[in-house]
């Protein structure tokens, strides 16, 4: 046996097969780098990106779950595979609608596509992280990529302002999380979630661990855009290209919630109940502030930005109920938010392409007469975000509500109901403007086929999952049970 073979056999070769989706996306990103320099064809670059994402999504089904690779730094369990699949599909729907939007703005930067893919890789690393080091690497890869995407409208001061605020607040979150990780490592001597869990319980929490947990919660809340760390959200969402806003509001948020759940269940399972009150306060503040400020918005895109802060509160409320039901509700709400969020923002993107459309609330006057189908789809998304049956948004809020009641957190359950009622003020306002007012313009509204397909697809699934939620709820319950049991490690 050669010296090289001896070294390899001694060290061990990581199982690269379990990261096949990540490899496909990485190769696609590097191909785009070369193609963008040589060809600069929008159609070719978009087609390559879509092909890579489809192949990556298909490869998820080829992976054997339960594998741990890279010396315990990367886990591929059912939880990570499901979230990876939905993150890839979310990115796919964003990408297919990016080209028509950029064409309408006469703005084209090929780097949009491969930076989105780098951000996606970071999110996929996040959801597969059983270790604070890999979690941090994935978090920063996705965050830095999104900083760039948020400021790609270089001549728009709103884009630059939003990106700058996001960069500053994101940098603060990075510093806070870094310090929290350092404190945890100093106390336990390990970055591994399960090792940390074996060394820390409710009987041996000292000042160092308490401080680390406070900092970790603050850092993660900042990344999730929870109140009072949400200040960057409306400006960053409003200034970014609307398909990118959809990516930021949905994919980045979902990946963050997946990480929060994995960290709390795997690294701190014995003290999650003691810290549930902190999550409950963040949830209540996000619901109250997000919904109240959304009431005052005249720009619908900015309104949906504050709405996303409120939805962060609904999801955090599920974390505040640290039970199997609560974790299932978190996973379920995270997955269904994809359909509501992508549908709503892509619909705005489609409308924004039209001449003199600024996403101001007055632009929606008479939309039902100018485009009956788009008005119907918008109504479905607004009803779902509000939580009106038979939409899936109702089932999501019902799951969180029942989890809170089961954990005797009545005050937060009441807050959820009251704030959902308050949110009717701005969700139904859009519906009233669409159906009860005369159009401000008679100009024809044009939409790309990909936009119509995406919006229709999301609207249909919002209704189907609202009427038949058992499949998604079953997936959520299974993932929650497996995560709590620690299966896959």
From Swiss-Prot:
Its EC number is 7.1.1.-. It comes from the Bacteria. NDH-1 shuttles electrons from NADH, via FMN and iron-sulfur (Fe-S) centers, to quinones in the respiratory chain. The immediate electron acceptor for the enzyme in this species is believed to be ubiquinone. Couples the redox reaction to proton translocation (for every two electrons transferred, four hydrogen ions are translocated across the cytoplasmic membrane), and thus conserves the redox energy in a proton gradient. Keywords: Cell inner membrane, Cell membrane, Membrane, NAD, Quinone, Translocase, Transmembrane, Transmembrane helix, Transport, Ubiquinone. The chain crosses the membrane at residues 19-39, 43-63, 78-98, 115-135, 166-186, 207-227, 241-261, 275-295, 303-323, 327-347, 374-394, 410-432, 455-475. It comes from Persephonella marina (strain DSM 14350 / EX-H1). Coiled coil: none annotated. Disulfide bonds: none annotated. The lineage of its organism: Bacteria, Pseudomonadati, Aquificota, Aquificia, Aquificales. One of its GO terms (biological process) is ATP synthesis coupled electron transport. It catalyses: a quinone + NADH + 5 H(+)(in) = a quinol + NAD(+) + 4 H(+)(out). It is a multi-pass membrane protein. This is NADH-quinone oxidoreductase subunit N.
